[in-house]
Structures are given as structure tokens and as C-alpha cells.
């Protein structure tokens, strides 16, 4: 009887007294055997409904699969209708909020605004970086008290006759002039009573052939030009002050003569200023 039922092909399940099920690759929705009746699960009201633990307790132990075609599974996805879709309108510009309107019309204005913000930020960052670098470099320089006590030694043989040489001393320009015999006689012959800041030439020099001055105009602090002006001494291009070869003010708005620093000759060829 069993052999006849086995050879009957499609009628084997009808002729057979027993049936058997073969597990497939997918778990069917219905089991071959009728499961025992069980009580429906009761939801614990103390737990929040929309949480991972509660959802995993209500869902099946394994993902539910329904066979739609030949070996084609379809998974079951839990859909939540209470999830709010984020709105990014606050981060978008007003010109591009309307999705039905072309953004090409406002592209130039939006690009111009972006370029303006970028340029402004770049200038601000560059200015801040300049200040930081300046402070860093200035911190490595000598302090004010060191500069105030500093001295400079000048070799006079390097300055030819009739020429003026400029040096930097205590952060200021220092003029050392090698005067000719003509300049010495010319400045010595000037009437002191005609000067705005009366001072004789011999009172401003220790050696007639050497004039040592601080090259800062007494008007507003500009640096005069040597061997220029109406009197052949120094000329301030800022406001037109004229000084003679002794550094005395002769014409223009400057009220005083050029300052003479403290100096001494250590030898016939060397002078120390400071």
C-alpha cells in the first residue's frame, strides 16, 4: 500500500495515511501542525509604547516573511506615523524656499552676498594675524629701557667730506654730517639774532667739521632730507621746513632747531653717540 501511494505522484497525499512537512529556506506563515492555544500577550501599560523594548516585545521573535513569488521574500516593516519629518526652512535663504521657482534668477545676488561675507572675513582674519605677528616680533626686540641706554659707535672715516650719513639710534634716524670748509665758514657767519631758535654754530658742535643731529623735524616729527632746502642743509618735505648745515631752523613752520644728542669722540676716527 505504501509503495502504491508513493508511486501515485500527485495523488500521494490523498492515498497516504500520514503527511510530512519539509522545512524550506523561509519560515512559512502557517505551521504544518496546529499550535497549542495560548493566551494573547498582554501589554505592560507601565512601559512607554514607542520604545525599543516595548516594540521588540510586541513584534514577532523573527522577521515575518511572506512568499510573493518563486523564492521572493518580502519583509515586514513597522511604520511609525508619529515621526515628524525635519524642516530645514530656517537654514535656507528666502529666495530658494519656493521649490516651484527657479533659483537661477537669484543666483547672482546670493553669490555676491557669499563673496562679500568671505572677503570681509578674510580681511578681518588677515588684520588679526598681522597684529599677532607684529606683537610676536616686537616681543623679541630690545625693551625700552635697553634702547634708552644703548649707544652707537660710528667710524668717521667712512663718511666723505661734504656728505651726510644716516644711522638708526634708539629707534630714531641719526644724521652725521662731514662739513666742508665753506659750510663751516658760512654757518659761523650767521647772525644769531636773525634765528628763530637762537643758537651759535659753535654751541652745536664739538668739532667744526662734524655735525651730529637727530633727524626728526621739530614740527610734526617727519624725517628731513639731507643736502636739500634753501640753505643747503636739511629740508622737511611734509610741511616745508628748511634747516641749515648746522641743523638750525631758518624757514618754515618748525619752531626749534634739530636736536643734538649726547656724543663724544673716543679717537680722531671714532665717535660714540649715547
Swiss-Prot record:
Mitochondrial matrix topology ranges: 79-110
Which gene name belongs to this protein?
Uqcrfs1
Q: Which InterPro entries match?
A: bc1_Rieske_TM_sf (IPR037008), Globular_prot_asu/bsu (IPR011070), Rieske_2Fe-2S (IPR017941), Rieske_2Fe-2S_sf (IPR036922), Rieske_Fe-S_prot (IPR014349), Rieske_Fe-S_prot_C (IPR005805), Rieske_TM (IPR004192), Ubiquinol_cyt_c_Rdtase_Fe-S-su (IPR006317)
Give a GO biological-process term: response to xenobiotic stimulus
What does the record give as the reaction this protein catalyses? a quinol + 2 Fe(III)-[cytochrome c](out) = a quinone + 2 Fe(II)-[cytochrome c](out) + 2 H(+)(out)
Instruction: Please list the cofactors this protein needs.
Output: [2Fe-2S] cluster
Give the principal location in a single coarse category. Answer: mitochondrion
Report the sequence similarity comment from the record: Belongs to the Rieske iron-sulfur protein family.
> What is an example of a GO molecular function annotated in this UniProt entry?
2 iron, 2 sulfur cluster binding
Topologically, how does it sit relative to the membrane? Single-pass membrane protein
**Cystine connections:** 222-238
- Where is this chain's protein located in or outside the cell? Mitochondrion inner membrane
Q: What else is known?
A: The Rieske protein is a high potential 2Fe-2S protein.
Organism from which the protein derives: Mus musculus (Mouse)
Cofactor binding summary note: Binds 1 [2Fe-2S] cluster per subunit. Fe-S cluster delivery to the Rieske protein is mediated by components of the iron sulfur (Fe-S) cluster assembly machinery that reside in the mitochondrial matrix (including HSC20 and LYRM7).
What's noted about post-translational modification?
Proteolytic processing is necessary for the correct insertion of UQCRFS1 in the complex III dimer. Several fragments are generated during UQCRFS1 insertion, most probably due to the endogenous matrix-processing peptidase (MPP) activity of the 2 core protein subunits UQCRC1/QCR1 and UQCRC2/QCR2, which are homologous to the 2 mitochondrial-processing peptidase (MPP) subunits beta-MPP and alpha-MPP respectively. The action of the protease is also necessary for the clearance of the UQCRFS1 fragments.
Binding-site list for [2Fe-2S] cluster = 217, 219, 236, 239, 241
Q: Which UniProt keywords apply?
A: 2Fe-2S, Disulfide bond, Electron transport, Iron, Iron-sulfur, Membrane, Metal-binding, Mitochondrion, Mitochondrion inner membrane, Respiratory chain, Transit peptide, Translocase, Transmembrane, Transmembrane helix, Transport
Name by which UniProt lists this protein: Cytochrome b-c1 complex subunit Rieske, mitochondrial
Q: Which stretches make up the Rieske domain?
A: 187-272
Q: What is its EC number?
A: 7.1.1.8
Q: Pfam families, from UniProt? A: Rieske, Ubiq-Cytc-red_N, UCR_TM
Q: Which PANTHER family match?
A: CYTOCHROME B-C1 COMPLEX SUBUNIT RIESKE, MITOCHONDRIAL
Which residues lie toward the Mitochondrial intermembrane compartment?
138-274
Q: Which GO terms describe its cellular component?
A: mitochondrial inner membrane; mitochondrion; myelin sheath; respiratory chain complex III
Q: What class of enzyme is it?
A: translocase
- From the record, give the transmembrane residue ranges: 111-137
